[in-house]
Amino acid sequence: MLNFSEQCLDMAQSILSRNIGAINDDGSISPLENELSLACEPGHAAMALGEFYRATGSTSLEGKDIVDLVSKCIMAQSNDAEYTEDGLAYLSLGLLAFGPSKDRNAVWDKLSEDTRKNLEKRLLSRTDYTDFFQVFNIAKAVARFSMGLSKKDETGKLIDRFLERIQQTSTGNYFDDKAESEDVIDGAFDIFGVVAFVFIRQSLQLHANMHLRDRKIPSLRTFAEKYLRLLPDVVRSDGLGWSYGRRIGAYGQMHCISMILQAMRDNWIAEDKMPEYMDVLRRLFQFFFMTYLDQENGYLVIRDEQRSAENSCTTRMANFDAARYLCQWARLAKTIGRNMNSEAIAEKNISKYVSFDNSGRKEQGVFIYKNAETAMHTCLPLVAPNASNTSSSLAFPHIPGIFDWPADKYLPILIPELTFGEHVTTPSYYGKRCTTGMGFRNSFFFRYEQPELINKDGKIIKGLGSCKVSWSFSGKKLVGDFIYSVQNQVTLDNFRLVVAIGAPHAEYHVPMTYALGQNGQGVSIEKDDFQANWLDTEVVSEDPEYRSYWGKIHYLQVYARDKAMVMRPGVQYRITIALEPDIAFAE
C-alpha cells in the first residue's frame, strides 16, 4: 500500500497548499465565494495541519510555518466569539499531534498567555451530551489529561458512558444521534455512527497513556464492528459509499475509508475477509478520487454548477477534512503495508434487513437489496431525520444516479406525501412489525406499519391515522404499496409523490457509475384511490436547489391531487407505485 500512501500524501499536500492561504492572521478562515464561514472551521484547519505534521514531520508548507498557523487557529477557536464544542475537539487533537505534553509541544510554546488561559478554560469545561457531541467530550478529555491540565483522566469513563447509552437507545447496539428536541422522534441511525467510532479511535491514538488505549479498544471494537460488517453490503459496485441520512456525498466516502483502514491497522478484519475489504476500500477510494477531487487544480469540490451539499458543510471545511483524512490514510497504509491491488470480488445477491432498534415504541433499520445480474443495488432506510428536514432520510429506495434527490431540500421522492391542514405526513422515519422475506416468483419483500402517522419533521401525530407499507423487490423491479386509514373523518388537503430525474456529474465521475438508460425509471402507478394525476414536467436543471451530492437533477415529475378529498374511517386508501429502471452506466 506504499503507492496508495504516497498518493494520499501528495493529494493532502496539494489540498492544504490551496487552502492555508485562507487562514487569516487572527486565525479565522476566509470562505469561498457565495459561502459563509462556520465557527468550527479553525479547529478543522488545526487538525488537518496537525495530521500533516504527523504524516511528514515537516513544520512548513508552501513557505508558511505550520506551527504558527495552528497557533492562530487555536487563538481564534478558543476565544469567546468563535468557540464551539466541535471546533474545540478538532483543535485539541490538532494540538496533540505536535506533542503529547506541554513540555514537548511546539504549538503550545507558540501560544500567548491569554490564548493558553482561554484554551484551558474551554478544555476544563464539562458538559454531558447524549448525542454525537459526546465524542467531542472524549477528545477534550484526552487533551486535558495529555496536556497536564487535569490529573484525573476521564477518557475511559466518558467512553464507557458513550457505549452504555448506545445499549440504552438501540436494541441492535447502533449509535443514535438523536435530536435535541423531545418532539422529534429519536433513532437517527446514519453515518454519524461510523464517524463517532472513527473519531474516538483517533482520539485514543493521541492519548498520552497507551495502556488506557489498549484497555478501551476491545469494547470499542464490539460496537464498531457492526458498522464494519455493514460496509461490504452498503458499498456499490462503482464504489459509492454511504448513501442515506445526513452528511453523505464526499463524507460518505471518507468516513467509510477511515473505518476500514483503522480496522486493518488494529487487526479487526479476519485474514479470509481481507480480500473483500481490500476490494471495498479500492472502490471507495476510486469513487472519492474521481468524483470529488479536481485533479488539475488539486482540491476537493463538493459544490459546483452540477452538485451541492448540506448548508452545514462548507467547501473550505470539507477541504481541510479531506486533507486530514488523506494524511491519516497515508500513515495507516504505511502501517498496514499490504498489497492493495487485490482482485475484484464477485458480486453476490443480497436481501437483508438490518435492525437498528426494535423497542416497544418503534422499530428502525435499513433494508438492503442487491441483484448482481441486473445491477440493482439499493438501501431503503427507516431511520429518524434528526433535525435535518431533507430527503436523505426518507424511506424510499436510495440509488444515486437512478433515483436521485436534492442534497439539502425536502421532496417526497417516490413515496406519497399526505397533507392534512398543518400536518404534512410521510411514511418514513419509523415503523412497527417490520418484516422481510421471500414472496412470489423469488421476489423479496420488506413491510412495516405506522400505527400513528408522522410528519416530515419527525413528529408523530396522535389520533390522525395509520399507514401500512410494503415494498417488493424482484430483479430490477421494485413495487411500493401504501395503504392509509384514518381514525375520524378528515379532509386531505393535498397529495403528491415526486419522481426526480437526474444524472451523474458530467465531468467528475467513475466510468461505471450508475446512470439512467434510454428507458428511464420505468415508473407506473398500478393502483390509486387518491385519484391523482401526473402534472406537467418541471424543468429544474438551472435551479441550484435541485442538485444532489453527485450530480444535477434535471426534471421533476409530480403525481398529485389538486383538490381536497374527504377521507372516512373504516375505508382503506391505497396507492401503489411500480419502478423498473433502465440501469446503465455513465461511460
Question: Where are each of the predicted segments found?
Answer:
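Extracellular polysaccharide-recognition and catalytic grooves
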Residues: 120-350
